[in-house]
């Protein structure tokens, strides 16, 4: 069990839920939740908040030494759609930030989780049952940073023995935080609009099929990977991971079962080309074999749970604009793609 855990990007989509779960599972372990901006949320004896820009290696080292950190969940990153609008920022945060974490892990003997993404795959990648080892050739700067990040992880593991572990995450669906500039944001935004307005304009075509995962499964996958014995980890770049794949139209149809008056129209934008370059179904058999990965939520279960949690939230007037009342909040930690 880790003595002190640092979570970068802790206010983001996955980071915020991961911090909660780490606090539950590892009672008594010091959790340091870091983000670029000071947080007003409640601290406790075992949970503290620190301001950290992951491109600042000196500040990172200060936090590691101050708390005696031995494990880092490195979730800070810039997403696909936002990355296309600011390529320099995307490269700086996603590459230099990761390199700083890996260097700290090398010198301080830390264990690291670093997420990758299905965005590492490109137009020449097999779209159906994409294998663990295959052509990548990403078409976005975000995907390029993630593919480069995988090579960095492999290098630090092979060259220096750093225990770094990674997952190629699909689109992540959750209700806890605002969307943050990803190509799969439609699969979250649609729930807010369905409940609050009864209609939604989707930015990908109806037949667009992408791999998705519900947040509880994503958190479980991350923690299960980190709990596995080192001898079980056969992939040192990043594991394929999957749960369910569905099209935008199939998601709409499932929501219709609960909200029959809901309507959806489709106006594809620049994100359509990004989605078209990604796989539709991922082969994650190696993760299931090596360390026992299995998902729990299918599409009907995801839709039911999302509506059950968001309906009372929106009834109180919270996040009526699909979470966009606080645009950009915690974007550095958002890794849903």
Q: Model-found features: residue ranges?
A:
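Conserved Rossmann-fold NAD(P)-dependent oxidoreductase catalytic core, especially the SDR/UDP-sugar
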Residues: 74, 99-141
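NAD(P)-dependent short-chain dehydrogenase/reductase
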Residues: 154-209, 215-220
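Short alpha-helical oligomerization interface
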Residues: 82-97, 130-138
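Rossmann-fold cofactor-recognition segment
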Residues: 45-56
């Amino acid at each position: 069990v880790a003595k002190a855990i640092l979570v970068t990007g802790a206010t983001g989509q996955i980071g915020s839920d991961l911090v909660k779960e780490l606090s539950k599972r590892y009672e008594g372990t010091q959790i340091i939740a870091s983000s670029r901006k000071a947080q007003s949320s409640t601290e406790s004896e075992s949970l503290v908040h620190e301001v950290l820009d992951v491109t600042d290696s000196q500040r990172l080292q200060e936090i590691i030494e101050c708390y005696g950190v031995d494990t880092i969940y490195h979730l800070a990153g810039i997403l696909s759609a936002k990355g296309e609008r600011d390529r320099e920022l995307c490269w700086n945060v996603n590459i230099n930030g990761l390199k700083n974490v890996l260097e700290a892990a090398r010198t301080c003997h830390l264990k690291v989780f670093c997420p990758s993404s299905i965005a590492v795959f490109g137009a020449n990648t097999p779209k159906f049952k994409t294998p663990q080892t295959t052509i990548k050739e990403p078409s976005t700067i975000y995907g390029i940073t993630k593919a480069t990040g995988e090579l960095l992880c492999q290098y630090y593991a092979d060259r220096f023995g750093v225990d770094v572990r990674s997952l190629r995450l699909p689109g992540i669906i959750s209700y806890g935080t605002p969307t943050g500039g990803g190509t799969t944001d439609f699969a979250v935004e649609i729930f807010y609009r369905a409940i609050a307005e009864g209609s939604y304009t989707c930015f990908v075509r109806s037949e667009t099929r992408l791999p998705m995962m519900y947040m509880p499964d994503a958190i479980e996958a991350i923690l299960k990977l980190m709990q596995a014995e080192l001898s079980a980890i056969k992939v040192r770049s990043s594991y394929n991971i999957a749960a369910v794949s569905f099209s935008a139209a199939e998601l709409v149809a499932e929501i219709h079962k609960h909200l029959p008056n809901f309507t959806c129209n489709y106006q594809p934008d620049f994100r359509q080309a990004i989605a078209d370059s990604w796989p539709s179904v991922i082969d994650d058999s190696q993760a299931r074999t090596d360390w026992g990965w299995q998902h729990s939520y299918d599409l009907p279960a995801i839709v039911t749970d999302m509506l059950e949690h968001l309906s009372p939230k929106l009834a109180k007037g919270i996040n009526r604009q699909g979470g966009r009342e606080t645009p950009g909040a915690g974007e550095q930690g958002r890794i849903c793609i």
